Regions:
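Residue-level detection of beta-strand scaffold positions
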Residues: 6, 121, 260-262
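C-terminal/domain-terminus segments
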Residues: 261-274
């Protein structure tokens, strides 16, 4: 049982902000508990990594999180900055890390895993770098994972949001169709992302069903001040903050408790029930 499921996006800057958020995670998890970190992409700024031996794995990941025990696993997805050079280096690093019992987990650019009472589906939203064949291959594979899902809660995450009032805005049409299609097929309860450097909770209606979007892109760079409420014309914004920090999900009595945290205080809480 994982005590905390921490959402961390847009973190790999090497900046002071990344180190401050790392200290926040240390305070949340403490030393004895076992916790899970969902890495929401842009793992290594500005241009990802060239090879598995790239020094940025050390400076922008290992060093900032060195005080977090290796029993706390970072289940990563790929962001747009991770595609600037060789995205496969991050997968290779993840496979080696898992073999050595280290933190970084990334067996593929899309995959599934389970924790507590949740089935997670990790997707690669960088579809502008994919052929239509590769997009369909990912889509069909995630559907296969969903067919085997047994847990009460279904959470999917990738780097790009479906809805957002931040600077990057809503997903483009082709990506929106992919994300919505998977949400509908798998009865996904929550979709999580980074990309915009803010924390947001958005209530969406997809096929007459409430689905929640969590954005947490405040893990390593100053917050994005841009706000465009026009992007909420078919959704409801429940919370927004552009202060650096994380989100934390706890499983309590089959409910999910979501906390939005900056480096000083808890900003907002929400309980998911079903």
């Amino acid at each position: 049982m994982y005590k905390n499921i921490i959402l961390l996006g847009d973190m790999g800057s090497g900046y002071t902000e990344q180190h401050e958020v790392a200290k926040l995670i240390e305070r949340i998890i403490k030393k004895k508990s076992k916790n899970l970190i969902c890495g929401l992409g842009d793992n290594i700024y500005e241009d990802g990594c060239k090879t598995i031996n790239d020094i940025k794995f050390k400076t922008n990941f290992e060093d900032p999180y060195k005080n977090i025990s290796d029993k706390n696993k970072f289940h990563m997805c790929l962001g747009n900055h991770d595609y600037h050079s060789n995205y496969k280096a991050q997968i290779q690093y993840g496979i080696l890390s898992s073999k050595l019992g280290k933190k970084w987990v990334m067996p593929h650019n899309y995959y599934t895993y389970s924790a507590n009472n949740i089935d997670f589906f990790v997707i690669d939203t960088n579809i502008e770098h994919m052929t239509d064949l590769l997009i369909r291959k990912q889509y069909n594979k995630i559907k296969q994972y969903m067919n085997k899902s047994k847990n009460k809660w279904k959470i999917m995450y990738g780097h790009h949001p479906l809805r957002s009032i931040g600077g990057h805005g809503n997903a483009r049409k082709k990506l929106e169709q992919m994300i919505k299609g998977l949400i509908s097929y798998g009865n996904v309860d929550i979709y999580m992302s980074g990309h915009d450097h803010s924390k947001q909770l958005i209530k969406m209606n997809i096929n007459n069903r409430d689905v929640y979007q969590i954005i947490c892109g405040t893990g390593g760079k100053p917050g994005d001040p841009y706000i465009n409420m026009n992007n909420m014309r078919d959704s409801e914004l429940l919370f927004f903050s552009n202060i650096i920090g994380v989100c934390n999900i706890r499983s309590i009595d089959n409910n999910l408790i979501l906390d939005f945290l900056n480096t000083k205080i808890k900003e907002f809480s929400y309980t998911f029930k079903k």
